[in-house]
Amino acid sequence: MKFIDEVSISLASGRGGPGCVSFRRESMQARGGPDGGNGGKGGDVIIRTSRHINSLVDIRQNKRYAAQSGRMGEGRQKSGMDGEDLILIVPQGTVFRNMDGEIIIDMTGISEHTLLKGGRGGKGNEFFKNSVNQAPEHAQPGEEGQEIEVRLELKLIADVGIVGFPNAGKSTLISRISAARPKIADYPFTTLTPNLGVVKAGDYSSFVVADIPGLVKGAHAGVGLGIQFLKHIERTRLFIHLVDASGMSGRDPLEDYTDINNELKMYDENNQDKEGFFPLSTRPQLVVLNKIDTLSESQLTKLKKQFKEASGSEPFAISAVTGKNIKEFVQELARQILKEEEE
């Protein structure tokens, strides 16, 4: 299924049904008193989340979604049927914005929300009967429904986000620590869409990790795949900053680390005025040196020292391919998440 994380649509609640003009028909009397019923209520627009979908691709199939209008009232004081509600099912973490970019509703911790109310049904002529007018010949029209244009923006919900250069081993890592099976190959930009994986850290403990397409220097200006997927890790508690420690592609691990952090800062600067934005550059990071199976002991010791000086904390060293230190890494990750939850 194609991954779609932004879509613009219009939503409309149903119009209320009109009231009915009707008079009783009785034997011996051609026209009895008024008995026109009220119109039915228009359907609401209800937003409901589902954890079983993770893309807006199905919603993109239509430009306009409308609830059903209420039916007209009938004689014998029968009310018209209410219009059927429109239930729009979206992934958890979907944000609804108006066309000015303001947040209308954030479906992060909410399972259901009535976004637009349907119009009220009009009163039938029986309602307007009084001592002065015993046979009113008018009824009320139904109330108009509401309509709005919205932009849906999906931000995946995960506890941990993995950031790093292409080929740092992000997809290999998430497949090693979870049941996720992203595409893995030895060339840049293998990952073209975000991947989510559930990591078990004990009998009763688990957390969700998000792997996004790799960043490169200049991503904020559109280089590579750009920074379009960074919004999917805005909700995470912390980052795994994964670094290719091998240097086999002619890269400098420390430069890669610095470049990624600079891209996060640029992303923050470009989005700081956006309502509902969560800065990324200040998010806690667990720096992880990957592919240590390609290094000698002395090379690894030297690299860890350099990273400790640069980041202010001891980096974690693993090999996602061989599984070296993976168990200890997952335990440390679980501890870090627990620490963030307590704070």
Swiss-Prot record:
One of its GO terms (biological process) is ribosome biogenesis. Its EC number is 3.6.5.-. The keyword GTP-binding applies. It is found in: Cytoplasm. It comes from the Bacteria. GO terms for cellular component: cytoplasm. Mg(2+) binds at S171, T191. Keywords: Cytoplasm, GTP-binding, Hydrolase, Magnesium, Metal-binding, Nucleotide-binding. Residues 33-43 have a biased composition (Gly residues). Its cofactor is Mg(2+). The keyword Metal-binding applies. Residues 158-338 form the OBG-type G domain. Residues 13-44 are annotated as: Disordered. InterPro entries: G_OBG (IPR031167), GTP-bd (IPR006073), GTP-bd_Obg/CgtA (IPR014100), GTP1-OBG_CS (IPR006074), GTP1_OBG_dom (IPR006169), GTP1_OBG_dom_sf (IPR036726), OBG_GTPase (IPR045086), P-loop_NTPase (IPR027417). GTP binds at residues 164-171, 189-193, 211-214, 290-293, 319-321. Belongs to the TRAFAC class OBG-HflX-like GTPase superfamily. OBG GTPase family. An essential GTPase which binds GTP, GDP and possibly (p)ppGpp with moderate affinity, with high nucleotide exchange rates and a fairly low GTP hydrolysis rate. Plays a role in control of the cell cycle, stress response, ribosome biogenesis and in those bacteria that undergo differentiation, in morphogenesis control. Monomer. PANTHER family: DEVELOPMENTALLY REGULATED GTP-BINDING PROTEIN-RELATED (PTHR11702), MITOCHONDRIAL RIBOSOME-ASSOCIATED GTPASE 2 (PTHR11702:SF31). This is GTPase Obg. It comes from Bdellovibrio bacteriovorus (strain ATCC 15356 / DSM 50701 / NCIMB 9529 / HD100). The lineage of its organism: Bacteria, Pseudomonadati, Bdellovibrionota, Bdellovibrionia, Bdellovibrionales.
